[in-house]
């Protein structure tokens, strides 16, 4: 499993409850561009329409050696999930007011996969508390070493 793109803002902005693996429907030049690490998933999220899952705001830069087949970098891309998974997560998102955010893109058995995190958004004071906890643990480790 080779990880290509990681959402570094995920654990700062969200509290992750569960992670799901999904396939993604891409064009050929998009796959080549992702392989060159020319993708950004930090602002992207998942929506459901007509019992299908789509990922929005996933920025895949145009392939440098591409031609007329280059597509819109921010186009909506379909996620490949089983129907029962879609229904299950759709109901859970509505009931618990959660969101689905991509956490990383990687290769698995010569296919690109997206790991999607079922998460709850953090408030501003939660983010501040996370920073304080991280600084306190860093200080504690520093004192242990000395």
UniProtKB/Swiss-Prot annotation:
Q: Where in the cell is it found?
A: Cytoplasm
The protein's name: SsrA-binding protein
Stretches with biased composition (Basic and acidic residues)? 127-139
Lineage of source species = Bacteria, Bacillati, Mycoplasmatota, Mycoplasmoidales, Mycoplasmoidaceae
UniProt entry keywords in alphabetical sequence: Cytoplasm, RNA-binding
The record describes the protein's role as: Required for rescue of stalled ribosomes mediated by trans-translation. Binds to transfer-messenger RNA (tmRNA), required for stable association of tmRNA with ribosomes. tmRNA and SmpB together mimic tRNA shape, replacing the anticodon stem-loop with SmpB. tmRNA is encoded by the ssrA gene; the 2 termini fold to resemble tRNA(Ala) and it encodes a 'tag peptide', a short internal open reading frame. During trans-translation Ala-aminoacylated tmRNA acts like a tRNA, entering the A-site of stalled ribosomes, displacing the stalled mRNA.
Pfam families recorded for this chain?
SmpB
Q: Which family does it belong to?
A: Belongs to the SmpB family.
Chief localization class? cytoplasm
CDD domains annotated for this entry?
A: SmpB
GO MF terms listed in the record are: RNA binding
Q: Which organism is it from?
A: Malacoplasma penetrans (strain HF-2)
Q: Where is the stretch described as Disordered?
A: 127-146
Q: Name one GO biological process term.
A: trans-translation
Got a GO cellular component term for this one?
cytosol
UniProt cross-references to InterPro entries, sorted A to Z? SmpB, SsrA-bd_prot, SsrA-bd_prot_CS
Cysteine disulfide partners in this protein = none
